[in-house]
């Protein structure tokens, strides 16, 4: 699989003075998990994030991804698009399990999928992302206990895996084009790098 279509473990970790704890910021195509009392932060437009944790141990994490457009078969569960989405979810879940989480204790909160990217309205990228994450978690038997999906506004999401608490701020006005440009660049990278290639799914 191309370097650009791999999910990367986020490396932007800093001290958040507002919440008085270490925090990890994740960008499109990244994920982060921890067993520590940390904060995970991201800003979502058309992308989606699944915040998944073991409700007993507090081991949890978050991803940030979008489904690439794979043409007419985009809604097929075996399309390149769905396979990439499955991969993005499985990478996070498998790392949680390796860190000591138990599958039967996993719960999820899901966010994003807004109609934010211009030119992507025809393919309803935000709606497809939102529906995919719902369907995936249902098939995997992971209960969604909260969601804030679709709409037209970007969101800033603060996730506290240890407690499961999430704070969501709707961004009704963007001061610059950073978010849109970042997601557009991510979408273009997914499109130009064949996601139908070698994607390994873990059992």
Swiss-Prot record:
This is Probable chemoreceptor glutamine deamidase CheD. GO terms for molecular function: protein-glutamine glutaminase activity. Probably deamidates glutamine residues to glutamate on methyl-accepting chemotaxis receptors (MCPs), playing an important role in chemotaxis. InterPro entries: CheD-like_sf, Chemorcpt_Glu_NH3ase_CheD, Cytotoxic_necrot_fac-like_cat. HAMAP family: CheD. Pfam families: CheD. It comes from the Bacteria. The gene is cheD. GO terms for biological process: chemotaxis. Keywords: Chemotaxis, Hydrolase. Its EC number is 3.5.1.44. Belongs to the CheD family. It catalyses: L-glutaminyl-[protein] + H2O = L-glutamyl-[protein] + NH4(+).
């Amino acid at each position: 699989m191309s370097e650009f279509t791999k999910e990367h473990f986020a490396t932007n970790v800093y001290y958040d003075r507002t919440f008085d704890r270490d925090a990890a910021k994740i960008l499109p195509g990244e994920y982060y998990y921890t067993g520590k009392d940390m904060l995970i932060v991201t800003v979502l437009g058309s992308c989606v994030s699944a915040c998944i944790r073991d409700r007993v141990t507090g081991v949890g994490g978050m991803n940030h991804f979008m489904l690439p457009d794979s043409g007419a078969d985009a809604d097929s569960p075996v399309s390149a698009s769905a396979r990439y989405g499955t991969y993005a979810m499985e990478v996070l879940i498998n790392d949680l399990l390796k860190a000591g989480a138990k599958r039967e204790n996993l719960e999820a909160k899901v966010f994003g999928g807004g109609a934010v990217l211009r030119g992507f309205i025809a393919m309803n990228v935000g709606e497809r992302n939102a529906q995919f994450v719902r369907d995936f978690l249902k098939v995997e038997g992971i209960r969604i206990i909260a969601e804030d999906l679709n709409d037209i506004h970007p969101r800033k999401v603060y996730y506290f895996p240890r407690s499961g608490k999430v704070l969501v701020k709707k961004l009704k006005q963007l001061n610059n084009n950073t978010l849109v440009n970042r997601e557009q660049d991510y979408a273009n990278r997914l499109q130009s790098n064949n996601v139908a290639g070698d994607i390994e799914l873990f059992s």
